[in-house]
Amino acid sequence: MAWFAANIPDGSVQVVFHPASFGKHGHFGGDDASRAAAFVEYANDPRLDAVWFARGGYGSCRIAEAVLPRLTAVARKKRYLGYSDAGSILAMLYKAGFPHVAHGPMSSDSVRNDATAWRAINWLRSGDPSSWEPSLATDPRPAVGFNLSILDALVGT
């Protein structure tokens, strides 16, 4: 939160962490039901413009199928950004036709104090194409990025 306060002092971007983000359940960030409920709550909240995954999403594959049927039209309008195991949820959203899904930096990466956090914020705010992989700007084909281990698990190789 300090990075956001220091770098966006006008408050034009506000970051809200769901209380479940700080949960503990074994090596997971909370039990599956709590994590699924938190994701659905924020995805369906019309006051929020985007969902930016906080960390790697370890265990997101365990909740991905449970959350999809609970997402509303509000959730479909949001932008979603994350990487690593969060790719399980990103893949599910992409497959379901959610138009604004990207594999990229997480909010926890902002502490690196480099351009990646700014590119992520600009994409989350407006879909700014300068934040994309450069080849995507001229290639009209759909493109999806994944952690290779997650992609391997998703396709079953």
Regions found by a protein language model. Give the residues of each.
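ATP/NTP phosphate-donor binding region
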Residues: M1-R47
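Short, acidic/small-residue loops that bind anionic groups at enzyme active sites
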Residues: L68-M92, H100-M106
